[in-house]
């Protein structure tokens, strides 16, 4: 059987099914950017490849997926980091005009080209560790023009680098100063102008919101979900990070792809997510960076069978992190996730959190040939080692 590329003498973690899907003597064959075969060499058809590589026992996993980032932004929040170290809370900083609003000012001042220029090094850091798909949110423009500018910048990242980009409109991220005291008026803008414009221009793959005391109420979040659904866009939600407003349950009832953060998630929210198949995206970098003490209810999520993804949450204020390898280690050490859960969290469950489970996230025939090839002895090394990048080769769409 003819194929474009063949990788042999490899060990595979296909991530298919519920475990790692380990194959000790494996082969991956691809043609036209799609996987033809991924499995035991003994069961492989007789392939006639245009290009074959012998991997000498290296491991192949699916390309890694970062399903929650805020890569596109200008400015930094190093000064706020110092304030937090001195005892100021995230809420206190936000209410004093810092936080998201300070990044908003810098992002509004930057043009699209500058935003791309600033985001590329962050994206490159993820790519260097095997990422083949990255979600990128807006949310620092908070006007129609500036949110669309951010989404265009996100699309341009995918043109500048060999990586899949999923752009998420996060217009309901914070209340801009010009709408102080009029959150409902700002939500009107998001629902009536921002979401329709992003959908009309094909700039957004999903819509997100920040349901929190310093963000938007459940009723306002529901309006955002309704507008997204009317525009034909799936939804996601920042929920239960700082308090429990029952946002995860609201998201699940709206059929959300994922609910993210979830430190304050309760049993009702877990049950709703399990019923809906909504992915729990945990963000250990933010938990670590803002020195949270309340852990997400991992045992409850496990018991209910809720799929768990993990992501960097790369952003300037609460998780200036651009390493999925470190994120996996944090997921294990801080949240007590297993190695299998961490690896699933940046592959098959991350794909599901983006609605891409039929396309990426596992090594299976018909899926995009997105691979990460590693110089390791066992998959646990990807979670165990700190400050270590054993990536040998990254393949995106067969190239």
From Swiss-Prot:
UniProt keyword list: Cytoplasm, Histidine metabolism, Hydrolase, Iron, Metal-binding, Zinc
Organism, scientific name: Rhizorhabdus wittichii (strain DSM 6014 / CCUG 31198 / JCM 15750 / NBRC 105917 / EY 4224 / RW1) (Sphingomonas wittichii)
Cofactor stoichiometry and binding remark: Binds 1 zinc or iron ion per subunit.
Cofactors required: Zn(2+); Fe(3+)
Enzyme class, UniProt record, top EC level: hydrolase
Protein name: Imidazolonepropionase
Reactions it catalyzes: 4-imidazolone-5-propanoate + H2O = N-formimidoyl-L-glutamate
Residues where N-formimidoyl-L-glutamate binds: 140, 315, 317
Membrane in keyword set: no
